[in-house]
Amino acid sequence: HGINFFTGVPDSLLKNFCGYIEDNVKKTSHIIAANEGNAIAIASGHYLATNKIPLVYMQNSGLGNAINPLLSLCDPDVYSIPMIILIGWRGEPGVKDEPQHVKQGKVQKELLDTLDIPYECISKDEKNINEKISKCVSLARKESRPVAILARKGTFEKYIIKNKNNSNNIMSREDAL
């Protein structure tokens, strides 16, 4: 789909996606952000510098951190910056999850609607995931706007990280302390 720049905040629902990116994308094309708003800003800078659509990944609870840069920077009414936002859908209605994710999951679609961010939902059982992703990328490119992909629990196949030392030089928790 022509996307070759990735930034975001890792999420348990996206761990297999993130592991694949970590192993298969150049370090300069994958930046783990401090928070989701920062990831939106990094992706915006990438687009402005290269005119290439980036992908931002996050857990749905992180969308709150991303609202300001999405509305004041990326929105079609402002600078019209296209990007794909891959969101791990924690707390999806009808899917067992931790209590802290229930409300965010319940309002996820309505929140994207309120923000006027078009979206598609994907899951491992669907036959047309590639079509949905193509539709999102085409819409982002055509309308020059953020478009979201909501990934349901279990969407991505298990991926074992091959190069465990390829961690963008991230310190372990113990090293940081």
Predicted regions and their residues:
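Thiamine diphosphate
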Residues: 1-117, 121-177
